[in-house]
Amino acid sequence: MASKLCRSRALASALRSAKPSPAIRCLATTSRNLINMPEGPNPRQFPREPLPGALNAAVVNPADKYQSKADNLHKYGSWLMGCLPKYIQQFSVWKDELTIYISPAGVIPVFSFLKYNTAAEYTQVSDITAVDFPTKDQRFEVVYNLLSVRHNSRIRVKTYADEVSPVPSITPLYDGANWYEREVYDLFGVFFTGHPDLRRIMTDYGFDGHPLRKDFPMTGYTEIRYDEEKKRIVTEPLEMTQAFRNFEGGSSAWEQVGAGIDRKPESFKLPTPKPETKPEEKK
């Protein structure tokens, strides 16, 4: 038995030292090394045919980029107004964005139509926010952004409110609107009737005011700090004062930084008037 084992080991060592045959080599190397590829020109280096014309001009005119979409959105907005003439006041199209304007009384009917109608199916609410216009009677503009996954379409719905008039909640229709409406209430003070849990979501407990209102002072009303003597967090009124901000007459609430850029077209710019020359008195 031992002699047979020694013979097999000697045979294996002899095979390893000898030059491998082509049959053995094909098992140890890839097939690419055994195939003789013809040497020819590289197809990637072939000369390319010249283009028929120079591509200096834009392929799509920026003015016509959204023309086809805008036409379809105008038709869709007109169709929505025809379906809900009692609630939709107007609509606007800017580029590829459709916006409809409704009254607070039409929130539930319009959103029910936009969600369940087969030509709309806006089943997802992407965002709810608000904008504060202090000079308007209805100072808050509540903005809803909806998404239709089935039709790959978006729509924006706007309504209005003030400090005391509420807006119906769409939480019974869209579960995702729960926290969005709480955020709008917390930061702007807009009330939503029918909301299951309308309370603050971002500011602290007992916070005074609504931070995103234009008349809210930048310094706030109170200061929260840790008192070393009392060994706890205390809330104290601020002694810092802020200059009165007037929103009348179209003036901005914020100071401009720098000279800015005048984007008015040249056709609307009036030439600088020349100073009047007084006629010389005759002597």
From Swiss-Prot:
Complex I is composed of about 40 different subunits. This is a component of the iron-sulfur protein fraction. This is NADH-ubiquinone oxidoreductase 30.4 kDa subunit, mitochondrial. Its EC number is 7.1.1.2. Core subunit of the mitochondrial membrane respiratory chain NADH dehydrogenase (Complex I) that is believed to belong to the minimal assembly required for catalysis. Complex I functions in the transfer of electrons from NADH to the respiratory chain. The immediate electron acceptor for the enzyme is believed to be ubiquinone. It catalyses: a ubiquinone + NADH + 5 H(+)(in) = a ubiquinol + NAD(+) + 4 H(+)(out). InterPro entries: NADH_DH_suC (IPR010218), NADH_quin_OxRdtase_su_C/D-like (IPR037232), NADH_UbQ_OxRdtase_30kDa_su (IPR001268), NADH_UbQ_OxRdtase_CS (IPR020396). Residues 258-283 are annotated as: Disordered. The gene is nuo-31. It comes from Neurospora crassa (strain ATCC 24698 / 74-OR23-1A / CBS 708.71 / DSM 1257 / FGSC 987). Residues 1-17 form a transit peptide. Signal peptide: none annotated. The keyword Transport applies. Keywords: Electron transport, Membrane, Mitochondrion, Mitochondrion inner membrane, NAD, Oxidoreductase, Respiratory chain, Transit peptide, Translocase, Transport, Ubiquinone. Its main location: mitochondrion. The keyword Ribosomal protein does not apply.
